[in-house]
């Protein structure tokens, strides 16, 4: 399809959707569906109109170049318009890129220590807090779903729901293995230790996204335990949900209520099943496009935090920042912005722009 034809079809569809919404003949479900479509089309149409307006102004200025009295003014106007066109064209191309349906969603964050013992658990706790601060800076709601500590106040497992607009779009690049290099507080010889933490960021799934049959679930209840293994209450409030077809297991004991723990576990289960479907779809598409930043593979080492050097390096794009204190304080924007630009560049190339 020719580029101009594609633009005309988008504008025509936007006008059609607007007319349907104004007809007063839609069911509530249809109106909601069309409202979502219109919200997606509106920024694309705005980019199309801005680019077309600039092209029309350019043509008008060029037409005046043959008029001796208007030539100087036309040349000035033409220079101004041509200076804006590259940015308008780039914005239009970005607007036309295929959208990840999950980008606008809230997200579920999961953090676990991997290699490195107690030091990995301590860094996992620090990273969990860093994402909490990043969420607060963005005005998102950070709700702890599960927070299990080890014996040295490190983290055995942390889960949180991060609610807000475009949370997944910003945090999806964080999935993977995060490596930390530093001297542990218990190290008397001053030797640098290397530890790793795994981070998973999943788009929050609604019940309509994933079908979970009760017959496919095994629900076990047990007494919640603390860091040392001791029982912390006398009732069986902890819940373990096993999805037998997939083998996915979710255990939850953060709440004192068995009902609340089960609801949280089901929320995590839906997100993991939804992400599994997305991963299968991504694997199919990956054959056509080698992506450096968009894999979301939690086994991939993506970043190193070197405390003695004050350095954070993202290995996917070879970005190094000597701002470790600020990043651990929740300032991830510079890294995420760079990763976003890299993926946009990959997508633009794949689309032939």
From Swiss-Prot:
Principal location class: cytoplasm
Source species, domain of life: Bacteria
Cross-referenced Pfam families: PCRF (PF03462), RF-1 (PF00472)
Keyword Mitochondrion: no
UniProt-listed SUPFAM superfamilies: Release factor
A molecular function GO annotation: translation release factor activity, codon specific
GO annotations of cellular component type: cytoplasm
Keywords: Cytoplasm, Methylation, Protein biosynthesis
Listed Gene3D superfamilies: 3.30.160.20, 3.30.70.1660, 6.10.140.1950
PTM text: Methylated by PrmC. Methylation increases the termination efficiency of RF1.
Modified residues (N5-methylglutamine): 230
Record InterPro entries: PCRF, Pep_chain_release_fac_I, Pep_chain_release_fac_I_sf, Prokaryotic/Mito_RF, RF-1
Compartments (UniProt record): Cytoplasm
PANTHER family named among the record's database cross-references: LD18447P (PTHR43804:SF7)
Role: Peptide chain release factor 1 directs the termination of translation in response to the peptide chain termination codons UAG and UAA.
HAMAP family: Rel_fac_1
Family: Belongs to the prokaryotic/mitochondrial release factor family.
NCBIfam families assigned to the protein according to its UniProt record, in alphabetical order: prfA, PRK00591.1
Name of the featured protein: Peptide chain release factor 1
Gene label: prfA
């Amino acid at each position: 399809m020719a580029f101009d034809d594609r633009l005309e079809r988008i504008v025509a569809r936007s006008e059609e959707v607007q007319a349907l919404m104004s007809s007063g003949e839609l069911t509530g479900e249809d109106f909601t569906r069309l409202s979502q479509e219109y919200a997606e089309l509106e920024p694309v149409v705005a980019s199309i109109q801005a680019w077309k307006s600039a092209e029309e102004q350019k043509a008008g200025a060029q037409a005046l170049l043959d008029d001796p009295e208007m030539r100087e003014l036309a040349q000035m106007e033409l220079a101004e318009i041509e200076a804006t066109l590259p940015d308008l064209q780039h914005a239009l191309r970005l607007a036309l890129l295929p959208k990840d349906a999950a980008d606008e969603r809230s997200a579920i964050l999961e953090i676990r220590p991997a290699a490195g013992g107690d030091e990995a658990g301590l860094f996992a706790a620090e990273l969990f807090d860093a994402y909490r601060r990043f969420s607060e800076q963005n005005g998102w709601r950070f709700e702890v779903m599960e927070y299990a500590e080890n014996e040295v106040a490190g983290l055995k497992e942390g889960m949180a729901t991060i609610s807000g607009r475009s949370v997944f779009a910003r945090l999806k690049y964080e999935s993977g293995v995060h490596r930390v290099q530093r001297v542990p507080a218990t190290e008397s010889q001053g030797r640098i230790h290397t530890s790793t933490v795994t981070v998973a960021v999943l788009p929050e799934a609604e019940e309509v996204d994933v079908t979970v049959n009760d017959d496919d679930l095994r629900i076990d209840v047990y007494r919640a335990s603390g860091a040392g293994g001791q029982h912390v209450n006398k009732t069986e409030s902890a819940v373990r949900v096993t999805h037998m077809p997939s083998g996915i297991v979710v255990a939850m004991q953060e709440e004192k209520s068995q009902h609340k723990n089960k609801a949280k576990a089901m929320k995590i289960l839906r997100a993991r099943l939804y992400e599994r479907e997305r991963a299968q779809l991504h694997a199919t598409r990956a054959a056509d496009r080698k992506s450096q930043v968009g894999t979301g593979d939690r086994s991939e080492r993506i970043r190193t935090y070197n405390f003695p050097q004050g350095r954070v390096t993202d290995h996917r794009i070879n970005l190094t920042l000597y701002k470790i204190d600020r990043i651990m304080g929740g300032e991830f924007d510079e890294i995420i912005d760079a990763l976003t630009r890299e993926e946009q560049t990959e997508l633009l190339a794949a689309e032939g722009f």
